Amino acid sequence: MRTANNGLLDLFDLEKKGVGLNHDYQHWKFNRHIFLQAVMPLSSTNKPSQYVNLLFEEMSNYWIDLKHKNDDSVVIDISTWMRRFTSDFISLLTTGQQMSTINYYYRMIKNEEVTKEMIDSENFIESINTFVSDNQILFVPKILRNFPIIKSRVDHMLGNCNYFYGKLVEIVRKRREEMKNSDDINKFISKKNDLLTSLIIANTQYDPQPQKNADPSLLRPMNDDEIRGVMFDAFVAGTDTTVNTFCFALYYLSHNPDVKKKLVEEIESVFQDDFNRPITFDDLEKLKYCEAVIKETSRVRPTVSMVSRYSSKSDKVAGYEWPSNVLFILYVRGINTNPLYWKDPEKFDPERFYDPQEIENQHKNSFSMFGGGPRMCLGRKIAMIEMKTLLALIYRKFDVELVDMQAPLQVETSTITICKELNVKLTPRKRVV
């Protein structure tokens, strides 16, 4: 397990839900099995890249519309835009439907009218942000739950989670109703092909990949609350971690012009001077340096600085015998910058993950961008697809500069490290004639 269950996970109805914070082994095993079964097919298709292309085109058109009248550039807080981008992306991937948070933010900047649907989408994303920014309250000992300052935070988070859960269950039930009322349910399922539909039909007569040899306890369908738990994980884990890693990458690229130059050269070698054609799954396979930049960003500035594991039985770790019920905390950033494993550990150098010799010499446990073991991030392949596609799209279409090269990264750390603000200047690139 990740933690000892002496906090408030049960109060927030997370103790047996989803996979990220689930503390019940049997429920976690079941949820993980179904989640993995649903998400893996998406990882090997063009669908994630198609959604990133679609949303980036919308967002970049807004940026171009916002550019200065006497200048060809626009200054934006990229972190604010990217939080809305990733929320719309996860919504498309999980439900097949876009929220409208990118459009909402653009209209607010332009002081244009917004619809109720847009406001609802914005409220939804804000509920995710609230959970991410204050989720350490989940681990407060139960005995402190009613202390004055803590009580107000707990009550606020409870209200936020109840709203979030309610919206997710509403989405699940609406999809079940759509399936029930469809003239041809098989055609409906084939057309949707999203995470939510896959979760609903898992272990039913409509499951295209029925499991026959699995543990019998894993062969039942999910109920609405169980699906809600998995959807919760998808939205929370699929938004902020990606946003922050992407923003940190832009920061470090701006401070390392040689690295940025090599990245742009790789992008140009794949796409030539075509700034507009959609990026495909096959293109991503060629963007090796782009992936190295993302990995090096995660090494230098991991979004999750500490990882915990709670032992359910006695074991031998690091040459010592440990009893059961011990909480182990791994300081990820410390490992990532330990000179025992990394040469010049403070230096931003993507060659560590690009040069074959560097990769071969790397200690196998010195870098774990997506965690390790059975609790490893289930959406890691999709996250990498999203970030690689985004990096290629933005540096293919724009020259990206920090507004203030002297300003330090504006971060806030709780259970994850959040990029609070990153102001960049974007200038559309021009084709070389």
Region spans (language model):
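Conserved cytochrome P450 catalytic core segment spanning the I/J/K helices
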Residues: M40-S44, N160-T245, L287, R309, ...
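Cytochrome P450 heme-binding "Cys pocket" and the immediately downstream C-terminal segment
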Residues: M99, P257-V259, R380-T417
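Cytochrome P450 heme-thiolate "Cys pocket" and heme-binding signature region
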Residues: K17, F232, A237, P278, ...
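Hydrophobic mid-domain F-helix/FG-region of cytochrome P450s
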Residues: F56-S60, V75-V114, Y165-R173, L195-L199, ...
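Conserved cytochrome P450 K-helix E-x-x-R motif and the immediately C-terminal K′/meander segment
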Residues: G166, E170, R277-A318, P339
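Cytochrome P450 substrate-recognition site 1
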Residues: M1-Y51, I78, M82-F89, R107-R145, ...
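Conserved cytochrome P450 K-helix/beta-meander segment immediately N-terminal to the heme-binding cysteine loop
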Residues: L330-E358
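Cytochrome P450
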Residues: S43-L54, D65-L92, T101-D120, R145-K167, ...
